[in-house]
């Protein structure tokens, strides 16, 4: 059975048109049992590909195309955990060297973008034979980039063959496409040079780990090269391998690939000419079609299936371990955590014995779950970060769902009492979810936050910690501008279109765009406007480049670069993994968010300025009932006041007229998409002013909605509503919260709604009360 072992996705950044999910789904539809994803110089799309392939029932094989300093791109496949680690470390060495020597990452330079290039056979630019180029460093590549000769600067950008040899264990090498090292050597140095390069690869990887790659994509000179490759494979005793090296999931994505090529080379479709691929053959092909194409060489097809079986490694065998916390002698992680939590509980609840007794029970329950899930080390490491901040007099505050944990409160990670506030612990941690908790720490932005980040590097090593990535994608306005330039639309029309489509950010990108473009003064029947709509829709959510998450850090026991490749971050002294926070979370890699807040910097500066004048301020001891402060709030005198400085907040403050601290909690929560979309703001304000009676959809909701006058304003209330009316467990309630997330899934929401209705029906809640509860909950789908 044929298996494609050299696919490229959109995570080759403008060199592929299909998302990893689309490739996996197409391979499954073609009844391929496996698929290998080999993106350029990275494993950026590997986690998404792994999840999608697992979901559709095919085996997700891992690899990458590695740019060589000597020229060409070398496809490498991970056969074992050792091979995967070697691939990650090879890619890391390539990427991080740019930071060490001050070189930028290789990317299309402006000089390379559309001026002085003629067509390569694969559709990428090749330098014209100018006098300045003759014999001075530019060699022709058939497939991809202009291939420079091995100069010092270029040696520092790509991986050398010596470095590849150092990391060859557990890897299988393919000889590559027209941009591979073998084809490049054949074209520039002739058969002798190509034979030398092939022998070098065999010496590096071993005869059983080098496959001579054949492709038939209706391209000039392809068969001549294939004949030479077949003869050399026979001479060397190497197996042949048929691939199509697809950049598309389906042939119909060719217009999108052309647009991406234009974006990459800063040109238009009108002017791109031979920059574009010369046909649409680089798509995932059905096995029978590959068998027909290679009818004269059936072993090349058969070898693909046999090699796919041999490639046993998937991301399931990632081997990530969270760091061990250095414990005092004789202590276990859970024992030391119990000791710290009990000591903190005695301090936190010293003034209220009744609450202290409730807190003891809650902390014991949480610690039991933490022990079962083996998470004690995680809490100790976050506690260690907080303690470092305190030692260094850096303001620090836990935020988010961690505030629902009595253990976090006792450890001093958070400042909200979840026992007194009756917060739902399962919102933070649940045995049913089977994943790591997520604790976010707010820090003063600037140098103080950077000191904490550097402390993490010092504690766990430069190769043991890194920032998480943020994948910047084509969406809305940005996508419109790029597509408009590709189509050579007038600048004023591009600007009009980009403003218009920005209003569609939170809708389905295909939501009758062509019809609605008339609103922007466009003729939807015009060929370029029609093509704009098609390309704008197709490019949505494709990756544009890799950014850095605002504060997420991942840490590892040992070397993180054996788990995921690292790259230099834009800021000196930092590194970033090639995966975003969702990818890391899905693969069990633990993230801690160290988030910088300008307001915390302002507070810290103010505290230090007051201390210099002899006034010591403790934020925890400031009175929460100062009438002067509430008078200012009621008058909307809040310019520059964190959380209540927006126009919407200032417009609402005189109507809500906060009088106590809990009123401020409501004030901040009420100006959010959930309450606004759900039409909850005005009912709450009317009830607060006594102009409307307080009612609840069902008596079981009265204790949950009492403090907010029968109107659900907090996600916490929604989860408790689901538990009270539909019998949801804490874990099921957390699933509901996820379905309500910003990137919500219509399918997931439909499943949750059906489960809510069934649960309420079992408890006798039907008709209008059930509908009112459903409306209240689903209104938070953008919250």
Give names to the regions the model predicted.
Residues 1-103, 107, 149-783:
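Alpha-helical scaffold/interaction cores of sigma-54-like transcription cofactors
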Residues 104-154:
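Long, intrinsically disordered low-complexity tandem-repeat segments
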């Amino acid at each position: 059975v044929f298996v494609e072992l050299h696919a490229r996705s959109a995570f080759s950044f403008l060199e592929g048109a299909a998302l990893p999910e689309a490739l996996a789904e197409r391979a499954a539809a073609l009844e391929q049992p496996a698929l290998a994803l080999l993106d350029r110089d990275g494993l950026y799309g590997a986690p998404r590909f792994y999840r999608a392939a697992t979901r559709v029932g095919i085996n997700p094989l891992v690899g990458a195309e590695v740019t060589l300093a000597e020229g060409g791109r070398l496809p490498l496949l991970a056969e074992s955990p050792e091979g995967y680690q070697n691939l990650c470390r090879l890619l890391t060495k390539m990427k991080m060297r740019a930071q060490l020597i001050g070189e930028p990452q290789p990317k299309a330079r402006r000089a390379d973008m559309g001026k002085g290039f003629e067509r390569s056979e694969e559709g990428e630019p090749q330098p014209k034979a100018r006098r300045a180029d003759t014999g001075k460093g530019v060699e022709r590549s058939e497939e991809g980039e202009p291939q420079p000769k091995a100069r010092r600067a270029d040696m520092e950008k790509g991986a050398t063959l010596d470095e590849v040899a150092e990391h060859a264990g557990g890897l299988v090498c393919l000889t590559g496409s027209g941009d591979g090292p073998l084809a490049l050597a054949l074209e520039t140095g002739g058969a002798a040079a190509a034979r030398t390069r092939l022998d070098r690869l065999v010496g590096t990887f071993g005869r059983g780990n080098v496959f001579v790659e054949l492709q038939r994509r209706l391209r000039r000179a392809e068969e001549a090269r294939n004949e030479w490759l077949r003869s050399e494979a026979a001479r060397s005793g190497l197996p042949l391998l048929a691939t199509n090296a697809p950049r598309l999931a389906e042939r119909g994505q060719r217009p999108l690939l052309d647009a991406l090529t234009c974006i990459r080379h800063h040109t238009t479709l009108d002017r791109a000419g031979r920059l574009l691929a010369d046909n649409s053959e680089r798509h995932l092909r059905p096995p029978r079609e590959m068998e027909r194409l290679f009818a004269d060489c059936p072993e090349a097809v058969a070898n693909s299936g046999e090699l796919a079986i041999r490639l046993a490694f998937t991301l399931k065998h990632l081997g990530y371990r969270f760091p061990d916390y250095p414990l005092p002698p004789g202590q276990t992680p859970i024992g030391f955590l119990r000791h710290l939590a009990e000591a903190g509980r005695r301090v936190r609840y010293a003034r209220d014995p009744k609450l202290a007794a409730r807190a003891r029970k809650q902390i014991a329950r949480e610690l039991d779950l933490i022990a079962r899930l083996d998470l004690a080390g995680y809490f100790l490491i976050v506690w260690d970060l907080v303690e470092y901040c305190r030692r260094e007099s850096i303001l620090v505050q836990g935020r988010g769902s961690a505030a629902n944990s009595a253990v976090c409160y006792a450890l001093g990670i958070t400042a909200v009492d979840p026992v007194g506030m009756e917060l739902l612990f399962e919102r933070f941690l649940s045995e049913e979810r089977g994943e790591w908790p997520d604790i976010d720490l707010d820090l003063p932005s600037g140098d103080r936050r950077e000191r904490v980040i550097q402390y993490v590097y010092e504690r766990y090593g430069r190769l043991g910690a890194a920032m998480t990535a943020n994948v910047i994608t084509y969406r809305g306005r940005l996508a419109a501008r790029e597509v408009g330039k590709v189509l050579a639309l007038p600048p004023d029309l591009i600007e009009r279109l980009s403003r218009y489509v920005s209003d569609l950010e939170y809708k389905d990108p295909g939501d009758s765009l062509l019809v609605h473009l008339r609103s922007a003064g466009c003729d939807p029947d015009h060929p370029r406007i029609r093509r704009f709509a098609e390309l704008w829709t197709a490019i949505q959510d494709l990756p544009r480049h890799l950014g850095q998450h605002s504060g997420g850090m991942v840490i590892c026991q040992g070397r993180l670069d054996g788990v995921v490749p690292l790259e230099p971050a834009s800021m000196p002294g930092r590194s970033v993994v090639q995966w975003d926070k969702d990818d890391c979370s899905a693969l069990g890699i633990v993230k801690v968010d160290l988030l910088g807040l300008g307001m915390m910097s302002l507070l810290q500066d103010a505290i230090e300025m007051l201390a210099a004048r002899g006034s010591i301020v403790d934020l925890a001891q400031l009175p929460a009932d100062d009438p002067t402060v509430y008078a200012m709030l009621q008058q909307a005198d809040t310019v520059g006041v964190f959380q209540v400085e927006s126009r919407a907040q200032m417009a609402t403050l005189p109507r809500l007229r906060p009088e106590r601290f809990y009123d401020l909690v409501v004030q901040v929560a009420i100006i959010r998409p959930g309450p606004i979309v759900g039409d909850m703001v005005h009912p709450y304000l009317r009830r607060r002013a006594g102009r409307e009676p307080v009612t609840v959809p069902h008596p079981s909701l009265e204790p949950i909605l009492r403090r907010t006058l029968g109107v659900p304003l907090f996600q916490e209330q929604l989860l408790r509503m689901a538990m009270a009316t539909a019998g949801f467990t804490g874990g099921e309630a957390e699933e509901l919260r996820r379905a309500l997330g910003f990137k919500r899934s219509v399918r997931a929401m439909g499943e949750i709604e059906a489960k809510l209705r069934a649960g309420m029906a079992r408890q006798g809640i039907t008709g209008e009360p059930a509908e009112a509860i459903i409306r209240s909950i689903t209104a938070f789908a953008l919250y």
